Amino acid sequence: LLLLLAHFAAAAVAPGLAKFLNRRAFLVLALVPAAAFAWLLAQTGDVTAGRSIVEDIAWVPSLGMDFALRLGTLQWLLGLLVTGVGALALLYCAWYFKPDDPSLWRFTGVFTAFAGAMLGLVLADNLLALYIFWELTTVFSYTLIGHNPVRSANRRSATQALLVTTFGGLAMLIGTV
């Protein structure tokens, strides 16, 4: 849970960090998924031995609703993939973006939050957590794809991604009800 919160906390401070460090902010932000990757690697022994790590937070106890995260073998493997690619992508962004890019400050926060939402999606252990992280990835992918609103192709692609993931989320919601 702390790894997820670290992603969202970093996303909250990322715009200010980008205004201060410019594109070098990506190098600092890459430390968050890299730390998650390192933590996942440290869990290799437990996970390969068949032990799961579970975090269960009561959300609405009277309705039996909780927010559950689990790290089993599949989640561990996908978590390594998500955090590893997330860290590498953030490192690449430090060289990809131009120093004077006006959308840099917005992109840093959204990308870091997206990386956290993807990790949450991988670790989700019940439908409530899965649905929350699915919807977060929907919103963040829309803003990432459309990060340059001046280009009509970006706006069109972002809208298409929003529609596809929203319909997927609606299908998931209908399936759970």
Q: Model-derived features: where do they sit?
A:
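...captures the hydrophobic TM-helix bundle architecture rather than a specific catalytic motif
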Residues: 1-177
